[in-house]
Amino acid sequence: MRTEYCGQLNLSHVGQSVTLCGWVNRRRDLGGLIFIDMRDREGIVQVFFDPDHKAAFEQASELRNEFCIQITGTVRARPDSQINKDMSTGEVEIFANTLNIINRSEPLPLDSNQINSEEQRLKYRYLDLRRPEMADRLKSRAKITSFVRRFMDDHGFLDIETPMLTKATPEGARDYLVPSRVHKGKFYALPQSPQLFKQLLMMSGFDRYYQIVKCFRDEDLRADRQPEFTQIDVETSFMSADQVREVMEKLVRELWQETKGVDLGDFPVMTFAEAMRRYGSDKPDLRNPLELVDVASLVKDVEFKVFSGPANDAKGRVAALRVPGGAQLSRKQIDEYGQFVGIYGAKGLAWLKVNDRAAGLEGVQSPIAKFLSAEVLDAILVATQAESGDILFFGADSYKIVTDAMGALRLKVGRDLELTRLGTWAPLWVVDFPMFEDDSEGGLTAMHHPFTAPKDMSPEQLAAAPTTAIANAYDMVINGYEVGGGSVRIHRTEMQQTVFGILGITEDEQREKFGFLLDALKFGTPPHAGLAFGLDRLVMLLTGTDNIRDVIAFPKTTAAACLMTDAPSFANPASLQELSISVVAKKGTTDAGAEENQ
């Protein structure tokens, strides 16, 4: 039906007869001529209709926005005075001699001349995707996935699919369950990741595996998360953590070069402990120059108990954040920052303005200055490298509260004062994570997942001191986003059973949930390691949006609902009966859907 795409026409096509298919983006009547901007997935071109071609001209007078049409015409060069430099096709136009109105359009529920609500955009997603910026993002996504496949194929990785209907295993989030009609009362789980299957593929001898795969997690959502998401999943045998990172860094560097024309350079490597100490986050945004400085040793003897208390507590922390030029902040702004850190559990935010660095106590302004000696003040100013015109913010509380609150404050101040270098890229690797962290019930949980190997520990050493164990794990972080994470896996039965035991998984539970894995580990399992990238998040970064829904064709809301199809929906009672399922309303509620499905 077409010979060319609208957005691909240029001066090389002048004089040619072309047939185009697409939509009316805009119509204008000027000087007895009818002009339309015609749009398809590749872009927009100007088409005009002359009264001399009566049939086409009369039809063109009926055109309205979003009519689906086909035209045939001749490509002409625009006069110099009419060239539109804002359009890729701005040097040419089409003189149409035939027009076929394929389908008419009702007035759109979305207004192209104003900002539509996200709810409206998601409800009419098929119309929202017609917008050039949305189409461009999905085209970029297609090019990115194509590049990844070529890279992985060229580096000896095999694209192998793993099951979508599998067994529920504890991986941190809730599973989406699928009832079995054949096996009454039993359920499949949609995979949170292909983790165990890709490890089993290494045990099968496939050596290098990858897959661009859908994963599912029933968890609370935010702007950069979806209940179903796409991973670039990777696993290797006989490669060290350093070797895996080298190949994956090469992939990302070449991807950025291909799509953005940017050389990311070598990625710095930072330990988890250093990232938390300096930036208050295990995914630090290094575009922001601000850093936290521990000052507990300097204030442990001051009379100000807000400082000295946490400074003398093994589980406490006192940290300072120096903001260059921050002395200009008003008291109102400072108070707003105090309220902000309260979100993270901080009871307050101490501050100190350095008006004259050389004047000692006389040169600072702060409610806490009276509690500081000249020596302590000078030590703090030296440690933070404070200068005249700066402000220092202080956090003093438990280690977690201070780290979380001051890390978040660092990001907010960096944005508010335009200190963060927008338009640049700051990748890094974060390594040496703790193997375990405390859970809410006083036990331990795996910081990554229970199949991650510890660094340089035997099963006996790990069992004796699990809280000191360092995981052989690594995360790739770009501009404050964790874009990928991986680890060296456990490849010996004894170590895997030890980890399960530390996590409180009994031997019976181990056999029930992971018997197939424990059996497989007995048969010459090779050392293996891997990583998974969040494809949606990578595309989000590369296309310059801050909402992951912008790079997914048909995303869910933050309530895990599809406004377009009205999913999830109530099931047919007959289908539920066949599955031996009865839906019961929660006590104290009147759920019509539950009654309908009983």
UniProtKB/Swiss-Prot annotation:
GO MF, any single term: ATP binding
Reaction(s) the record says it catalyses: tRNA(Asp) + L-aspartate + ATP = L-aspartyl-tRNA(Asp) + AMP + diphosphate
CDD domains documented for this protein: AspRS_core, EcAspRS_like_N
PROSITE patterns: AA_TRNA_LIGASE_II
Binding site for ATP: 217-219, 226, 482, 534-537
Entry-linked Gene3D superfamilies: Bira Bifunctional Protein, Domain 2, GAD-like domain, Nucleic acid-binding proteins
Pfam families tied to this protein: GAD, tRNA-synt_2, tRNA_anti-codon
Keywords: Aminoacyl-tRNA synthetase, ATP-binding, Cytoplasm, Ligase, Nucleotide-binding, Protein biosynthesis
Residues the entry annotates as binding L-aspartate: 171, 217, 448, 489
Any GO BP annotation: aspartyl-tRNA aminoacylation
EC number: 6.1.1.12
GO cellular component: cytoplasm
Region (Aspartate): 195-198
Localization (cell): Cytoplasm
UniProt subunit comment: Homodimer.
Family: Belongs to the class-II aminoacyl-tRNA synthetase family. Type 1 subfamily.
PANTHER family: ASPARTATE--TRNA LIGASE, MITOCHONDRIAL, ASPARTYL/LYSYL-TRNA SYNTHETASE
Function, as annotated: Catalyzes the attachment of L-aspartate to tRNA(Asp) in a two-step reaction: L-aspartate is first activated by ATP to form Asp-AMP and then transferred to the acceptor end of tRNA(Asp).
Protein name: Aspartate--tRNA ligase
Organism in which the protein naturally occurs: Yersinia pestis
